[in-house]
């Protein structure tokens, strides 16, 4: 049995955007029967919130949409940098990951998976200083991009063969 495919989401503090994406994507994969085939993690580029729960507003939006909320913030480390795919929530995160030595082919912007993002900026705006509606907007942006990420996973799993 081969190791599971590893996808990690990266934002600034790992308490808002990346844990939302992680929880949403991981649950969707479990519902598709791929929970053992794909490992989903998240991390922040900074260490300010290491060990903290997700922001209560992020957790509230996840809970309202039926997603789990258990989370402990982490800073990007060796485990995350070794992921098959590192999904950056904004351009600064992508740049930092490349500066840390991650090959450009393994770094993607989350919104690049949403074909409807078109002319919109690829950044997912940080809702930290916003209100509930900003967190709902982040949820909607993530939700729109995840089908494309599922397609990426399906293609990788098909190419790599069954685990």
Swiss-Prot record:
Activity control: Phosphatase activity is stimulated by phosphorylation. Inhibited by sodium molybdate, sodium orthovanadate and sodium tungstate. Inhibited by S-nitrosylation. Subjected to substrate activation, triggered by pNPP or by phosphotyrosine. Is also activated by phosphoserine, with serine being ineffective in enhancing PtpA activity.
Outcome, altering residue 45 to A: Slight decrease in phosphatase activity
Keywords, ordered alphabetically: Host cytoplasm, Host cytoplasmic vesicle, Host nucleus, Hydrolase, Phosphoprotein, Protein phosphatase, S-nitrosylation, Secreted, Virulence
Keyword Coiled coil tagged: no
Effect seen on changing residue 53 to A: Lack of nitrosylation. Does not affect phosphatase activity
Biotechnology and industry use: The important role played by PtpA in virulence makes it a highly promising target for the treatment of tuberculosis infections. Several classes of potent inhibitors have been developed and studied to date. Drug candidates include, among others, stevastelins, roseophilins, prodigiosins, hydroxypyrrole benzoic acids, difluoromethylphosphonic acid (DFMP) and chalcone derivatives.
Post-translational modifications reported in the UniProt record: Phosphorylated on tyrosines 128 and 129 by PtkA. Both Tyr-128 and Tyr-129 together are essential for PtpA phosphatase activity. In vitro, can be phosphorylated by several eukaryotic-like Ser/Thr protein kinases, such as protein kinase A (PknA), which phosphorylates PtpA at Thr-45 and increases its activity. S-nitrosylation at Cys-53 decreases activity. Modification does not affect substrate affinity, but decreases protein thermal stability and promotes a local effect in the surroundings of the Cys-53 residue, which interferes in both protein stability and function.
InterPro entries in alphabetical order: LMW_PTPase, Ptyr_pPase, Ptyr_pPase_sf, Tyr_phospatase_low_mol_wt
Phosphothreonine: modified positions: 45
Any GO BP annotation: symbiont-mediated suppression of host innate immune response
Effect on the protein upon substituting residue 128 to E: Loss of phosphatase activity
Effect caused by changing residue 8 to A: No change in phosphatase activity
CDD domains: LMWPTP (cd16343)
GO CC aspect terms: cytosol; extracellular region; host cell cytoplasmic vesicle; host cell nucleus; plasma membrane
Gene3D superfamilies the UniProt entry points to: 3.40.50.2300
Residues annotated as catalytic: 11 (nucleophile), 17, 126 (proton donor)
Residues modified to S-nitrosocysteine: 53
Protein name: Low molecular weight protein-tyrosine phosphatase A
Encoding gene per record: ptpA
